[in-house]
Amino acid sequence: MRVDGRKCNQIRPVKITRNYTKYAEGSVLIENGDTKVICTASIEDKVPPFLKGRGEGWITCEYNMIPRATQVRKARDINRGRIDGRTMEIQRIIGRALRSVVDLRAIGEKTIWVDCDVIQADGGTRTASISGAFVALVDAVNKLHKQNPFTIYPIRDFVSAVSVGIVNDTRMLDLCYLEDSRAKVDMNVVMTDSGEFVEIQGTGEQNPFTREDLKELLALAEKGIKSMISAQKDSLKMDSLWIGTGGE
């Protein structure tokens, strides 16, 4: 039995609240157990200099935790004068995950800024951010599509993420903070609805792990991601119908 009473192959309860803020084209509060993240998607009618004139768009992410999202207050990056390595890594993985399922040429020369702000952290903040950010992205893209329909609808598939690990010699899905802090092996997995992998981040925190461990952890992750994508679909309802159609 786990610390919160779940089975080893269960994710925490997931709740996705859309249109959570007033101004962003897409905004979501995602709650994954006691982890809570506000995700917004904002559209800008320009692209970074390296994409100017190429006829394609860009999706980029900023990730942050409010100071008391954690048990002990963490100073804001601005007060430290730099973005720490963990924050930079998480921003990049969220951006890569979203870009992997979007036809950037179909967007045209626009940038979609995704902001993920953790307001309460209990493990899995990066994976919850990816899952919530995708829903915010869909809402933002749909607003563009309704205003001026795309020739090709840009979003090709759902994408979501989950953590898995080995705690007390037991393989577990969707680790809370206490489990994550005790994990001998810790892994974050990003997958699409069609079952393709976008990213696998795996580390033997205390011990090496076997090929069999990897196989079983990926199977657990796939099960969890199916549940997360089901929550995304339940949240989006009819607004997800264009995904993967090319706009037909």
Curated annotation (Swiss-Prot):
The keyword rRNA processing applies. Its EC number is 2.7.7.56. SUPFAM superfamilies: Ribonuclease PH domain 2-like, Ribosomal protein S5 domain 2-like. It comes from the Bacteria. It holds the Pfam family RNase_PH_C. It is an enzyme of class 2 (transferase). It catalyses: tRNA(n+1) + phosphate = tRNA(n) + a ribonucleoside 5'-diphosphate. The keyword Transferase applies. Keywords: Nucleotidyltransferase, RNA-binding, rRNA processing, Transferase, tRNA processing, tRNA-binding. GO terms for biological process: rRNA catabolic process; rRNA processing; tRNA processing. Phosphorolytic 3'-5' exoribonuclease that plays an important role in tRNA 3'-end maturation. Removes nucleotide residues following the 3'-CCA terminus of tRNAs; can also add nucleotides to the ends of RNA molecules by using nucleoside diphosphates as substrates, but this may not be physiologically important. Probably plays a role in initiation of 16S rRNA degradation (leading to ribosome degradation) during starvation. Homohexameric ring arranged as a trimer of dimers. This is Ribonuclease PH. The lineage of its organism: Bacteria, Bacillati, Bacillota, Clostridia, Eubacteriales. The gene is rph.
